[in-house]
Amino acid sequence: QVVARQEHYESLRELIDRELRELNFGDLTDTAMAAAAQLRERQAVPENYRITDPDIGAGGQKMKYQNNVAAIRLLKTLEAEERQASPAEQDVLARYSGWGGVPQAFDAHNEKWAKEYEELKELLAPDEYAAARGSTLNAHYTSPLVIQSIYDTLSRMGVQPGTVLEPAMGVGNFFGLLPQRMGDAQLYGVELDSITGRIAKQLYPKANITVSGFEHVNLPDNSIDLAVGNVPFGNYRLSDPRYKQYGFLIHDYFFAKTLDKVRTGGIVAFITSKGTMDKQDTAVREYLAQRADLLGAVRLPSSAFSKTANTEVTTDILFLQKRDTPPEQLPDWVQLGKTADGIPVNRYYEQHPEMVLGTMIWDKSMYGNEKETSCQPLPDADLKELLAAASAQIAMPDAERLARPSRASLEELQASVNMPQDVRSFSYTVQGGKLYYKESTSL
């Protein structure tokens, strides 16, 4: 029995040895290593930030200041360590809201802000400090409520863009609230301020973000499906030879250049100063009407930005669809009308008073003492409900034009965005191993 048992064990050992010899441990090792590499790769791929807090950017001036400083300190740490922000760190960066709501931090004579004034001077490089101080005039960020309303309107229209442009993006709240149905779109953002633009790059690493003035950005004409954003507004002009003859104020310039970049049938959904619609001079509206159809407009109450920007200013949301040819006759919205109380407003609002989400009154301008009009909020009104009702009244875009493809490929778009500033117009350049010809502003 002992001998038989020994022979059994030896046969079993031979069977095990033969099975082990037939196993390909090299393949198993390669498979395990490949799986580990794929896992590391998935973990290393940075993701665009998703805004889930409806009150992001809200708060008092001191809180905004503290959030801004925390974001800047983190940004400088990330850049020193040459790494991408983690999701938890993106939460900190996303609370940066710019300096439009806290100009006191740059006032050397404000005793209540003396500590913050000194802290900022130490934290920021001289060029960063100068840019931040200069941004207090128009760096007013948009509330998620208003952005969500814009996207709800675009979704109802059936807008399904392949490319999205935000030409004055701040830290990118429009990108952070992009609907899931638009998640495959290629994102292009532009931001003038260095600190803000660098934060945006950390928040949206999959987007193509250019830190520069919009007037210096190279994009092919007729290449963008959808442009969204809150354009800067003020009584000053940018230097761009292409548009010099028109003398556009900054907010009107953003409309003009963006319409050139959007393809025929594409949509522009911008928040702008009420001056675009209400100024007495009709030249800008004539320019826009020759190039785009106004699908609708919503006048926001002056309180719409009070939580996120600590400012009260009357603004409009405009929805435009680019035309291929000028209309035979200029539309009514080029002209001015009056409210029932005799307040001058755009004729669109005269004909559609339900799109004014407040009461138009005479007021003092945010830029001086000259008498101006503003949209006073309705008492106890729910802005979310008002926006939903107004959104339902926006006209549908022309479906045939909406479905047209862009004239520029994504490859051409990318090459134009990455083109060095010193490439001269009407000359050849190599981008990504391919030869391109630069026209006036794009490849």
Regions found by a protein language model. Give the residues of each.
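Conserved proline-anchored active-site loop of SAM-dependent methyltransferases
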Residues: 147-157, 161-179, 189, 200, ...
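Charged, often flexible domain-edge or linker segments that flank or initiate folded functional domains
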Residues: 23-95, 99, 113, 172, ...
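Conserved beta-strand segments of alpha/beta enzyme cores
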Residues: 186, 207-208, 293-296
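Short loop/edge segments at beta-strand edges and connector loops
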Residues: 210-213, 298-299
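Class I S-adenosyl-L-methionine
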Residues: 45-203
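Flexible, glycine-/basic-rich loop-and-beta segments that form/coincide
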Residues: 307-404
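Conserved Class I SAM-dependent methyltransferase catalytic core
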Residues: 194, 247-306, 313, 317-319
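Long amphipathic alpha-helices with heptad-repeat character
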Residues: 2-5, 9, 13
